[in-house]
Amino acid sequence: MKRTIIMMLDSFGVGAAHDAEAFGDVGSNTFGHIAKACAEGKANDGREGPLKLPNLARLGLGHASKESTGEFPAGFGDDVEVIGAYGHADELSSGKDTPSGHWEMAGVPVLYEWGYFSELTNSFPQALTDKILARAGLTEFLGNCHSSGTVILDELGEEHMRTGKPIFYTSADSVFQIACHEESFGLEKLYELCIIAREELADYNIGRVIARPFVGTGPGSFERTGNRRDYAVEPPAPTVLDKLKAAGGEVVSVGKIADIYAHCGITKKVKATGLEALFDATLEQVKLAGDNTIVFTNFVDFDSHYGHRRDVAGYARSLEYFDSRLPEILALLDEDDFLLLTADHGCDPTWPGSDHTRERVPVLAYGAGLEAGSLGLRSSFADMGQSIASYFKLEPMEYGESFIR
């Protein structure tokens, strides 16, 4: 029985990419800087001491990081019996965003430039917002700027609730984000507004419109909910997910995977919110999975809760929780199964600002007849997609070199 389980640790980079200078990210290292802060006692909120990831270390995480940066992260070394194949990958895609990383690892790099709203204030063209408002039956909106999602709620959440004006904002990514209160504005109304925005953005080449529903009564109590939706453009070519689906296989999305791929190549969607629930849902879907199935989970909290918010201790806590549950996944694997752990970009919680960082990502592969040891530097995330295609004996992808023979 052939099954692939992909666990995407959203934003868990292992050191600056070869082209990090073009992004202002030379020296960024999500994993390494978290480990360093833990070793120095600077990440003791809700945990303490060195970063403890024994199961990820056995899969080769520390070794992959050393190959990427030239040194082991603090607290990691070669005194571990590695049971998996490990490597690190550079990105071909032009951006350091979520769709680019996900699509490329599924065999389809983004070799064109996304559109961006680069102005920090007055970020959106008035012609665009006028059309969105007119179609939605609204007259005004709030925001029109770059912001972190939690900051803008404290700044504008009360005014939004009082006036009913939606909050439009963006970031360094190719996104148009809309935040609205679930109760005072309404969840379905927010989704309808996002669909309108998605349609009106067709000429702007924006990767995603993101619905950001929240609850609460005032600054300090506002909280984003698990009802986020991403309205992405479709990948520019069929991914390995599409190819497996076309061949009669099953592709199970856990969490926001389906949204990231614009629901292309997905046969089943499982909703889950939060690290614990996402892990539980992954376990359940692996138990249910039959032959020729991909179970694909995005563990978004690493990025959204801790990377962007520059919360080193929170990131470390969540990594340690994730690591503690890995034996549950390993226990479910059959001899022929293929487990793949990776990331889509970096988001170094020690880095200035609140945006993603251009980093190499870990490639931790277990099963599928792979011998334990180094896979080296992969020149593209697409090597993972090509390897999945090879594993399922699908038609080869245009990009990537398989590490499964």
From Swiss-Prot:
Mn(2+) 1 binds at D10, D344, H345. Pfam families: Metalloenzyme. The keyword Isomerase applies. The keyword Cytoplasm applies. Its cofactor is Mn(2+). Its EC number is 5.4.2.7. Belongs to the phosphopentomutase family. Pathway: Carbohydrate degradation; 2-deoxy-D-ribose 1-phosphate degradation; D-glyceraldehyde 3-phosphate and acetaldehyde from 2-deoxy-alpha-D-ribose 1-phosphate: step 1/2. The gene is deoB. InterPro entries: Alkaline_phosphatase_core_sf (IPR017850), DeoB (IPR010045), Metalloenzyme (IPR006124), Phosphopentomutase_DeoB_cap_sf (IPR024052). SUPFAM superfamilies: Alkaline phosphatase-like, DeoB insert domain-like. Its main location: cytoplasm. It is an enzyme of class 5 (isomerase). This is Phosphopentomutase. Binds 2 manganese ions. It catalyses: 2-deoxy-alpha-D-ribose 1-phosphate = 2-deoxy-D-ribose 5-phosphate; alpha-D-ribose 1-phosphate = D-ribose 5-phosphate. It comes from Shewanella pealeana (strain ATCC 700345 / ANG-SQ1). Mn(2+) 2 binds at D303, H308, H356. GO terms for molecular function: magnesium ion binding; manganese ion binding; phosphopentomutase activity. GO terms for cellular component: cytosol. It is found in: Cytoplasm.
